[in-house]
Amino acid sequence: TLSLHDALPIYDYLTFHDFSLKYLIDKYGTPFRLTYLPRIGDQIKKAKNLFNKAIKANNYKGEYFYCYCTKCCHFSHVINEALNHGVHLETSSSFDIDLIRRLFEKGRISKKTFLIHNGHKTDDYLDKIVGLLDDDFENVIPVMDSKVEIDRLLARTKKDLTIGIRMAINEEPQSAYYTSRLGIRSTEIIEYYKQKLARKKKVKLKMLHFFVDSGIKDTLYYWGEFRKALKIFADLKKICPSLDSINLGGGLPIRNNLAFEYDYKYMIEEVVRNIKEVCQEEGIEEPNIFTEFGKYTVGESGAIIFKVLEAKQQNDAELWYLIDNSLMNTIPDAWSIFEKFILLPINKWK
């Protein structure tokens, strides 16, 4: 069983990037997980190339920064491969800061690497973020997930702070909930800046972050939330000169079915064009663009191989395969949100 693409049957067996899966099965048995590292680099290079081309084509003045979400996959070989291609890093928990420390100790990142700190900030998480500041990491950006986080952060350090704000979004119409638990309400951000952040001499607001669960998709819902975020960015920029970056949370989609189609070039061009258009309309400078890609970075690089132990025909239409592990255990994230994935046999192609 294979949950990836770029796999072709040769000699009655499926291969992955021209590598024999049968060889691995014969050597290691099943089940096992594999990662094809070159695919990670391919994905990063593709996104960087398309954003930089769109920036050049639109005579866009801001820069582009690709961030890898460490929570997506913590395996050292995966993160090291991503870092080989010049990514910056996004964290969402105190555990991720330990990982950041280890990467720095090994020389894999520098103190100039952008570190975007998202998520709810526990005391331990805040303490570790402050620890990075105290050790003179230059591009630490804690993103405020609620209005109270800034006071909790300032109580821990006398250092100057460069921060972001996360804008809460409305969920898709078919969602079970109307709002997101993360971020500050869009209608409250301007007032929050005026009444709170603007009065803090040691605080510089650099980034507006918004995250759409569906990812960057060509839908009315996505473009509606996107344009709302751009309007708030423009209004903020007019009263906050230090605001120079917009962070597009929610990644690019990956191939999860054999008929997958997505025009990456068009969507990235539209993202850049829309930002430039709003900036021209509002008379503001074009911001740097940050993206946070986790699943997009690694999702097409890995596979899990199972053995079918028994096939059970339970009625005329349903044939069940009993496998030698559990989807709940091996792909809990995909399993829990009913995510689709490619499933292919390795043998019996002829």
Predicted segments with their positions:
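Short glycine/threonine-rich loop-to-helix capping motif typified by GTGT followed
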Residues: D218-G224, R255-M267, V298-E310
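Short, small-residue-biased leader/transition segments that mark boundaries at the very start
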Residues: T1-L8
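Active-site-proximal beta-alpha core segment in soluble small-molecule metabolic enzymes
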Residues: F65-S245, I254
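An N-cap/entry alpha-helix motif that binds or orients negatively charged groups
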Residues: S20-K22, D26-F51
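Charged (often Lys/Glu-rich) extended helix/loop segments that serve as interaction or gating elements
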Residues: E270, K276-Q280, I284-K350
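Catalytic cores of soluble, metal-dependent hydrolases
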Residues: W223-I246, L258-N288
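N-terminal glycine-rich anion-binding loops that anchor highly charged ligand groups
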Residues: D12-F19
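Glycine-rich beta-strand-to-loop/alpha-helix junction loops that act as flexible
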Residues: D213, I246-N256, T291-K295
